[in-house]
């Protein structure tokens, strides 16, 4: 079944309409937050009726889950395990952390809208924040923490709670992205490429946790 687009003439399939509503919802949520955005406003911006929004997403919770699923399945998704797979197989610590840092920085640069949306969700104590934590953040800690633990057993890295190492690593990357996207978009404090940032952050981390020969 198809419906007519707001512009008239062209017709949009159900899945295309669903994606359009999702994109509009992400845009509005990232600008106004969740409390400041109604389904009526989403419908108006998407050029559909509010009933059409609920036809595709029966509840707001279903819409939030669809947003995460849409981001996870998009072509520019950030999959740490896949991104670092080759370096992990070679036990290349520099390659692991540098590839992950660069991948995350590029992802944040290409999708600042989703980063703003996640900040809104956390500040408003919105359920999307917990959904994102469970679906992504927790998995990153488990995956990267597991690699660090293995390298500690092999004597390559010093003994330290792997969660602390992961927290420090993510902290450097996230702070840099937040500065570039939100606080200092003109990059007056620090203006370096993502490649350079990833390299230097990896230097700092490995100089702190590598076992000196």
Enumerate the predicted regions with their spans.
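Short secondary-structure transition hinges
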Residues: 88-90, 105-143, 188-191
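Short, flexible, glycine-rich and Lys/Arg-enriched loop motifs at helix boundaries
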Residues: 69-93, 179-193
């Amino acid at each position: 079944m198809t419906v007519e687009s707001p512009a008239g003439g062209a017709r949009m399939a159900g899945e295309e309409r669903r994606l359009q509503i999702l994109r509009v919802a992400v845009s509005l949520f990232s600008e106004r937050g969740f409390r400041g955005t109604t389904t009526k406003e989403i419908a108006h911006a998407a050029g559909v009726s509010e009933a059409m929004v609920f036809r595709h997403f029966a509840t707001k919770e279903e819409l939030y889950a669809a947003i995460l699923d849409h981001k996870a399945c998009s072509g520019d998704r950030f999959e740490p395990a896949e991104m670092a797979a080759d370096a992990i197989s070679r036990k290349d610590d520099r390659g692991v952390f540098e590839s992950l840092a660069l991948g995350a920085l590029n992802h944040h640069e290409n999708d600042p809208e989703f980063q703003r949306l996640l900040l809104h969700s956390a500040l408003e104590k919105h359920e999307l924040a917990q959904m994102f934590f469970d679906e992504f953040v927790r998995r990153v800690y488990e995956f990267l923490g597991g690699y660090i633990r293995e390298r500690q057993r092999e004597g390559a890295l010093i003994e330290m709670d792997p969660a602390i190492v992961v927290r420090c690593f993510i902290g450097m990357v996230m702070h840099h992205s937040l500065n570039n996207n939100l606080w200092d978009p003109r990059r007056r404090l620090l203006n370096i490429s993502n490649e350079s940032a990833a390299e230097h952050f990896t230097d700092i981390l490995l100089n702190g946790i590598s076992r000196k020969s």
